[in-house]
Regions:
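Non-catalytic helical/linker scaffolds that mediate oligomerization, partner binding
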Residues: 1-217
Length: 217
């Protein structure tokens, strides 16, 4: 059993029957599995404002940085023009279990006018237009596709109980918030292995300026 197979069943996915009816408009690297549907948000602030209203978003960026973490947390999925499987967006999204596609080179983003175009098409996509992402395959769609929520899978629990009898090492998690830690513990992690301190200096809960971080380093 490949680890990726276990990972995929723990995420919401696009409904296979609905996805078959849609056409792929672009593809990128499948950085983090799962499915996501939402309206385009070009900034973290826009994603956060939409989340407060109960609106799901796809955060569209050329690439992400630590300053985007609050918007990344608020959105349903992440789509970047640049980046690889070890880019900031990919690493953070996988750590959170959030759908993410990176390196979508066919996408051109005009941030000034808040417009997206995809290679081979003159169609423009604006903030508020719908996108659907298949993070397991790296597919991008311009229609709202039905999703299937992930639920507790008794076979997954049974499998983990079996392999737990034979493992020879402990597993700790990367976590930046109490919510991250609680989620990891629920999946069997035994503690915290890495805490990225730079995330304390960004986002809505950050009270210490970046200069303090630089001084500390």
């Amino acid at each position: 059993v490949a680890p990726a197979q276990l990972d995929e069943i723990l995420h919401p996915i696009l409904d296979p029957a609905s996805e078959k009816k849609a056409s792929v408009i672009a593809n990128g690297l499948p950085a983090s599995p799962g499915g996501a549907v939402g309206v385009i948000a070009f900034t973290s602030e826009a994603a956060m404002e939409a989340a407060e209203k109960g609106i799901a978003t796809i955060l569209v960026r050329e690439e992400t940085s630590p300053e985007d973490v609050e918007g990344m947390r608020a959105c349903a999925g992440i789509l970047t023009q640049r980046g690889g499987m070890t880019s900031h967006a990919a690493l953070v999204a996988r750590g959170w279990g959030k759908c993410c596609i990176v390196g979508c080179e066919a996408m051109h983003i005009d941030l000034e006018n808040k417009v997206i175009k995809f290679k081979g098409s003159d169609k423009e996509y604006h903030e508020g237009d719908v996108l659907s992402l298949n993070g397991a395959k790296g597919y991008v769609y311009d229609v709202a596709i039905d999703t299937m929520d992930a639920s507790d899978n008794p076979r997954f629990v049974q499998f983990m109980e079996i392999v737990d009898k034979f493992r020879t090492m402990g597993v700790r998690t990367n976590a930046d918030t109490p919510e991250d830690a609680a989620r990891a513990i629920s999946f069997g992690a035994e503690g915290i292995g890495l805490f990225r301190i730079e995330h304390m200096f960004y986002g809505q809960n950050a009270e210490t300026p970046l200069s303090k971080l630089r001084k500390m380093i």
